[in-house]
């Protein structure tokens, strides 16, 4: 009888262990799914008016014009990690995809970058002024300079940029390029 009790007791312990492990695994799976969703939400749901968003794109292209002067048309799209206000200045932390194109090469970019950027913005009445554009150093200097120019929460996001976000940026870029090519083709046909 004591042997039967021992087996039953061992079975109960084994059953409790299996249930506990299953619950822990489910919690990890659920938490993992939530963190991915939160990462995307944090990246895409930061409010920024379209006027400022357009100005940021135009300014990034202007700051990098010397790198793209051999291309006919330049485009920039970005994902914003967040903003901070300090001393009447807004610091915008983002990941920028900028590329230059020629009609001859169609949708094949001729130059560009994909990198984290900090843009410093001030407001003058209803207008925004881009005061500064800062990107991290290359190679071994990349992470230290990124962490120096950005809060850790934004630097961490930039260093762990997902393929989903990169694909989203590339998709938006291709939409803009295709629209430009279509417009330039229509202009040529009207002549």
Task: Label each residue range with its predicted role.
Residues 5-6:
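Acidic, low-complexity, intrinsically disordered interaction modules
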Residues 9-19:
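Bacterial N-terminal signal peptides that target proteins for export
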Residues 19-27:
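Hydrophobic helical h-region of N-terminal Sec-dependent signal peptides
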Residues 29-32:
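C-terminal motif of bacterial Sec signal peptides marking the signal peptidase cleavage site
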Residues 35-96:
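N-terminal export/targeting and maturation segments
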Residues 76-77, 81-139:
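Mature extracytoplasmic domains of secretory-pathway proteins
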Residues 138-191:
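C-terminal partner/receptor-binding element of secreted or periplasmic proteins
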């Amino acid at each position: 009888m004591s042997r039967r009790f021992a087996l039953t007791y061992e079975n109960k312990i084994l059953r409790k262990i299996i249930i506990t492990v299953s619950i822990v695994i489910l919690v990890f799976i659920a938490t993992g799914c939530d963190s991915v969703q939160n990462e995307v939400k944090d990246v895409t749901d930061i409010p920024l008016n379209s006027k400022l968003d357009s100005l940021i794109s135009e300014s990034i292209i202007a700051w990098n014009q010397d790198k793209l002067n051999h291309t006919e048309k330049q485009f920039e799209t970005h994902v914003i990690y967040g903003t901070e206000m300090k001393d009447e200045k807004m610091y915008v932390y983002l990941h920028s995809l900028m590329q230059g194109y020629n009609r001859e090469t169609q949708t094949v970019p001729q130059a560009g970058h994909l990198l984290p950027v900090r843009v410093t913005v001030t407001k003058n009445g209803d207008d925004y002024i881009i005061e500064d554009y800062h990107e991290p150093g290359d190679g071994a200097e990349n992470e230290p300079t990124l962490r120096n120019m950005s809060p850790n929460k934004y630097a961490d996001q930039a260093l762990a940029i997902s393929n989903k976000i990169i694909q989203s940026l590339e998709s938006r870029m291709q939409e803009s390029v295709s629209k430009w090519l279509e417009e330039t083709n229509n202009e040529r046909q009207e002549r």
